[in-house]
């Protein structure tokens, strides 16, 4: 595709299997497909032990302080949780240097994506994104009957900055930037982020997905967004580096308390449990543990990437807790082979045969390194 050209995705709807009373717009929506569970892996293989390297969880686990906080919160399960997560929002705001009124808490960052898309989009509005990227943007966009404008990424999966700037200048209702990007691991440089913002009208809402930010804190996102001056939301999560994927905890920071107020009108009441709030607060306050786990993960990622380089395997420059690599054997064949070695990875539909593999504990990565040569050369 020539630089600067855009794709407007208009996929044909699925043929309904029954006379559905549901909204017609949902007929063309494919639901999100999560990574394989441990139970499914066991059913398929008959094995009982696996390294789960498909969903970018932190296999090192959360801070030890989380378990104590969870047990304390369980003492009163009959009491509703704080509906606004005020204690957690105050702690987040204090560390990030923003008013708690600009912080929103959600059950996972996917819920925050949903809130923003439903609050912002009318049918026919446009969303600008760059594929391949996290599929829920397109899913929620189609549920909102929005028009998806896709500026495909370059061959190395970096954002095509001039093309995105040209598309952003046309004033989409919502601009989505994922950095580091899922599933490729690429991260925006500060100069490129600044260029995209400079091209974007202040009538556009900018949504920045920073679920993997702890692995690559390259620049002050909030300061650059505030300097731009339009409406924005940055989404972050406790599911990755903080190790709380099973408790579903995400949070975001917005450009203004007024924007958060609109999101609160959509957010269901009591949507974040008392246990999840307590766990997130304990994890948030143990920054020493967070740093140790992030540092170890980055070091282990470098070890895996060095092996890939020695093997001559093409991979991206990942800035997250996973590697994204091309499999000569094909993604499905590679994933199936590794599954029977006790390794669950994520095949992707990205053209060219790419798989995404979470960086696990050192022992998980040892097993992966030992199994990769055969899995990639089937």
Curated annotation (Swiss-Prot):
PROSITE patterns: AA_TRANSFER_CLASS_2. Pathway: Amino-acid biosynthesis; L-histidine biosynthesis; L-histidine from 5-phospho-alpha-D-ribose 1-diphosphate: step 7/9. One of its GO terms (biological process) is L-histidine biosynthetic process. GO terms for molecular function: histidinol-phosphate transaminase activity; pyridoxal phosphate binding. Its cofactor is pyridoxal 5'-phosphate. It is an enzyme of class 2 (transferase). The modification N6-(pyridoxal phosphate)lysine is found at residue 240. It catalyses: L-histidinol phosphate + 2-oxoglutarate = 3-(imidazol-4-yl)-2-oxopropyl phosphate + L-glutamate. Its EC number is 2.6.1.9. CDD domains: AAT_like. Keywords: Amino-acid biosynthesis, Aminotransferase, Histidine biosynthesis, Pyridoxal phosphate, Transferase. It comes from the Bacteria. Homodimer. PANTHER family: HISTIDINOL-PHOSPHATE AMINOTRANSFERASE, HISTIDINOL-PHOSPHATE AMINOTRANSFERASE 2. Belongs to the class-II pyridoxal-phosphate-dependent aminotransferase family. Histidinol-phosphate aminotransferase subfamily. This is Histidinol-phosphate aminotransferase 2. It comes from Caulobacter vibrioides (strain ATCC 19089 / CIP 103742 / CB 15).
